[in-house]
Amino acid sequence: MNINATLIGQSVAFLIFVLFCMKFVWPPVIAALHERQKKIADGLDAASRAARDLELAQEKAGQQLREAKAQAAEIIEQAKKRGNQIVEEAVEKARIDADRVKVQAQAEIEQELNSVKDKLRAQVGLLAVGGAEKILGATIDQNAHAELVNQLAAEI
């Protein structure tokens, strides 16, 4: 193989081309590659952060849902207790009212019974005096009559 001027000229031209590429072409290509690599890394980091944020949000939503269910159960339990308390209060009030009505009715019955007894005593006294008048054939004066009726009523 002969080394001639053409081969040396081509080698020098190639060396100039390589130096030109290293000086002017290679730095922007490397910069573009680094920029692209950085964008990809940032995108992966953002995706990772988004996945963590999503996981945290789901966990937080689950916790809030559990808290809401617990709070709802507590509210329902309080409502049941309050409902039972209202029913018990109503039953107690009804019992007290029934006792009051019963006592009042017994008092009215006792009063009516005493009134009927007094009327009956008066009628029995009048009948007794009337019967005694007929038997004796004489009339007793009104004062004695009233005194006799009262005495008989007291005895009866």
Curated annotation (Swiss-Prot):
Organism: Pseudomonas fluorescens (strain Pf0-1)
Subunit composition and interactions: F-type ATPases have 2 components, F(1) - the catalytic core - and F(0) - the membrane proton channel. F(1) has five subunits: alpha(3), beta(3), gamma(1), delta(1), epsilon(1). F(0) has three main subunits: a(1), b(2) and c(10-14). The alpha and beta chains form an alternating ring which encloses part of the gamma chain. F(1) is attached to F(0) by a central stalk formed by the gamma and epsilon chains, while a peripheral stalk is formed by the delta and b chains.
Family statement drawn from the similarity comment of this UniProt entry: Belongs to the ATPase B chain family.
GO cellular component: plasma membrane; proton-transporting ATP synthase complex
SUPFAM superfamilies: F1F0 ATP synthase subunit B, membrane domain (SSF81573)
Keyword Lipoprotein: no
Domain of life, source organism: Bacteria
Keywords: ATP synthesis, Cell inner membrane, Cell membrane, CF(0), Hydrogen ion transport, Ion transport, Membrane, Transmembrane, Transmembrane helix, Transport
Keyword Transmembrane belongs to the record: yes
Membrane topology: Single-pass membrane protein
Record's subcellular location: Cell inner membrane
TM region positions: 12-32
Gene designation: atpF
Protein name, entry field: ATP synthase subunit b
Pfam families per the UniProt record, alphabetical: ATP-synt_B
GO molecular function: proton-transporting ATP synthase activity, rotational mechanism; proton-transporting ATPase activity, rotational mechanism
HAMAP family named among the record's database cross-references: ATP_synth_b_bprime
Function as written in the Swiss-Prot or TrEMBL entry: F(1)F(0) ATP synthase produces ATP from ADP in the presence of a proton or sodium gradient. F-type ATPases consist of two structural domains, F(1) containing the extramembraneous catalytic core and F(0) containing the membrane proton channel, linked together by a central stalk and a peripheral stalk. During catalysis, ATP synthesis in the catalytic domain of F(1) is coupled via a rotary mechanism of the central stalk subunits to proton translocation. Component of the F(0) channel, it forms part of the peripheral stalk, linking F(1) to F(0).
Predominant place of localization: membrane
